[in-house]
UniProtKB/Swiss-Prot annotation:
SUPFAM superfamilies, per the entry: Kazal-type serine protease inhibitors (SSF100895)
UniProt xrefs under Pfam families: Kazal_1
Chain positions of site Reactive bond 3: 18-19
Alphabetized GO MF terms: serine-type endopeptidase inhibitor activity
Annotated compartments: Secreted
Predominant cellular place of this UniProt entry's protein: secreted
Protein name (record): Ovomucoid
Signal peptide: none
CDD domains reported for this sequence: KAZAL_FS
Listed SMART domains: KAZAL
Organism: Pipile pipile (Trinidad piping guan)
């Protein structure tokens, strides 16, 4: 099984659209979409990873 990851190279973004495509982070928090998740990854200095797609 390949590790699940998301390309966050084009983040952080100053504003995220309100699209609902939830992702579950390694902090067991559900992020609304890739944009909000990637902004959190940047804020965590790369310590936050993707647990899985969908709600936690």
């Amino acid at each position: 099984l390949a590790p699940v990851n998301v390309d966050c190279s084009d983040h952080p973004k100053p504003a995220c659209l309100q699209e609902q495509k939830p992702l579950c982070g390694s902090d067991n928090k559900t992020y609304d979409n890739k944009c909000s998740f990637c902004n959190a990854v940047v804020d965590s200095n790369g310590t936050l990873t993707l647990s899985h797609f969908g709600k936690c």
